[in-house]
């Protein structure tokens, strides 16, 4: 297919138009007085959002060169979202500023390769300084502040802080759509997996249709149980103890299931059977997790263990087990705390090593189930449009909170970038064009605060000068239009988000400046449809 070519200044300017179109759309959402953007959807109602990466993903431009520029900046937002989960608008804005300032210098004859070296030096110094002013997150209040700033909603901040307090920093917090109007928090303590009882006759509470077992024994196996003779020896031992039993197996069928149900209905003894969670290798790992949590042993053929030889000391134990139609929750497993700790360390190591997002998510879920539990934030709203917007805000706030716990917090509202300018300005280089790269970053670091001020309807330059001349940590509260100590006022950003936004913006922008030619496909014009009846002469 034939291609179009553009060179030098012409190519860079065309791509810059695309960068500006995308960044100008995204940056209106920045700060407490930022607005929303409406995204048209092929199916369903339009999406109203202030999430930078969601907006960037929707933008495709008609002109191929402009689109190239837009796609490069889209990568900045996407990468920042992947690493930190928030800060995508800031990253896009910084990329636009670095490209704009950089192109001015390249047009004036500066060498883009040397400018790139200066940009890298300045960014490394800025990141080093950001880490110096970072403070660790201390307690529930700090977590609530980070989430509230990210979502621009104090109620959401409190909700996320409650969730993290209940399940711990390692716990899993999921976000679901609620059937009601309100947003609420639902916490499941202990190990939960999505398998319910194999027969409704096993339920102990017929009104709620769930089985609750107090201090039960737990038999864990990866085998199918069809013949009651296989588990008869262990059942006899349990009946003598007067305890209840939970069986987790690949399947329970036929005679075995019938016998268990009949004994339950007669009141001889209570036993609930559930299918093992997961599939394939993941199932083996999950069964091992349950065994370690409850202090039991997995009865597996490959380990040479037979169901007929099972003794009481091979069974797991827990304070209570609750089984519904779809879920099983094991609360306070009586496993050895040291073994549980070792298992958690092992899963953490696997998370570090894996490159698959799906595997990482599943490992994180397993980690949470061992470490504390799962919290579900159920998001409610009056309309579907509001629900989607609210859900995106909560997702961003949750990501920001996790980032804050990981690397700490810095003064928010663009203040951290202003605070590091002094140190970056002191960098020097013998090469003039490298010096220009440093100056480009110095100028670009002002941009987030300038945009926050602009979105609040005030002149950014005045605000920037005032913050520069104030002590470190003092910034501009755009919501109330006054200068405050940002951390004391609860206006904070996660260090990881602030750092990632700058690093990703500089990475793509510095490479953008080195462009000398652009190659694009010639757009194909669709041939016009022939008029009806053409070429059909003489036909009736």
UniProtKB/Swiss-Prot annotation:
InterPro entries recorded: Chaperonin_Cpn60_CS, Cpn60/GroEL, Cpn60/GroEL/TCP-1, GroEL-like_apical_dom_sf, GROEL-like_equatorial_sf, TCP-1-like_intermed_sf
Enzyme Commission numbers on file: 5.6.1.7
GO molecular function, one term: isomerase activity
Reaction catalyzed: ATP + H2O + a folded polypeptide = ADP + phosphate + an unfolded polypeptide
Keywords: ATP-binding, Chaperone, Cytoplasm, Isomerase, Nucleotide-binding
Main location: cytoplasm
GO terms (BP aspect): protein refolding
Keyword Signal: no
Pfam family, one: Cpn60_TCP1
Binding residues annotated for ATP, in chain numbering: 29-32, 86-90, 413, 477-479, 493
Keyword DNA repair in record: no
One GO CC annotation: cytoplasm
The protein's assembly and partners: Forms a cylinder of 14 subunits composed of two heptameric rings stacked back-to-back. Interacts with the co-chaperonin GroES.
UniProt-listed PANTHER family: 60 KDA HEAT SHOCK PROTEIN, MITOCHONDRIAL
Role: Together with its co-chaperonin GroES, plays an essential role in assisting protein folding. The GroEL-GroES system forms a nano-cage that allows encapsulation of the non-native substrate proteins and provides a physical environment optimized to promote and accelerate protein folding.
HAMAP family: CH60
Family designation: Belongs to the chaperonin (HSP60) family.
Listed name of the protein: Chaperonin GroEL
